[in-house]
Regions:
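Conserved short alpha-helical segments that host acidic/polar catalytic motifs at enzyme active sites
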Residues: 1-167
């Protein structure tokens, strides 16, 4: 079962996100990842296949990842094999939108085909990446309004899910 954590505040986000993910380890997972934003800089994505220990080592327990806002995820594969590429978070092609997700997007293939026709690229075999790119499409279409982008995307996504986005 997937686990989702998020943090925004006055402290470094990565160690807090990793601590939150460690509290979800009992649920089982095949990969984990975090996305952290440091002010106006691009969102930094760090992922690892396997145990959370691998992600902790890659990030020096989060200490090497600056930023005070982030999201994290432990994944139990439902679409796509367990791999670093399929691990969450996923990010839009331009890096503006990152997301973690739990659940199933039933119409992800249909949405993916529409986005491919609009020039989007896909690197994973997850339904989550489709959701990120769909939100990004509406984010660009509606002049950079996160609320409008999410609202328009949610009307089109069918399934049972939780989705946490970071802009």
């Amino acid at each position: 079962m997937c686990g989702i954590v998020g943090f925004t505040g006055r402290h470094q986000a990565a160690p807090i996100l990793l601590d939150g993910l460690s509290k979800l380890e009992y649920r089982g997972y095949d990969s984990a990842g975090i996305a952290v934003r440091d002010g106006e800089k691009d969102i930094e994505i760090i992922k690892a296949k396997g145990r959370l220990k691998v992600l902790l080592e890659k990030t020096n327990a989060g200490e090497s990842v600056p930023g005070m806002c982030g999201i994290g995820h432990t994944r139990w594969a439902t679409h796509g094999e367990p791999s670093e590429v399929n691990a969450h978070p996923h990010v839009s092609d331009n890096g503006n939108v990152a997301a973690v997700h739990n659940g199933i997007i039933e119409n992800y293939q249909e949405l993916k085909e529409k986005l491919l026709r609009r020039g989007y690229s896909f690197y994973s075999s997850t339904d989550t990446e489709v959701a990120v790119k769909l939100v990004d499409y509406y984010y660009q279409k509606y002049g950079g309004s996160p609320v409008e982008a999410v609202r328009h995307a949610m009307v089109r996504i069918r399934g049972s899910y939780a989705l946490v986005m970071m802009f």
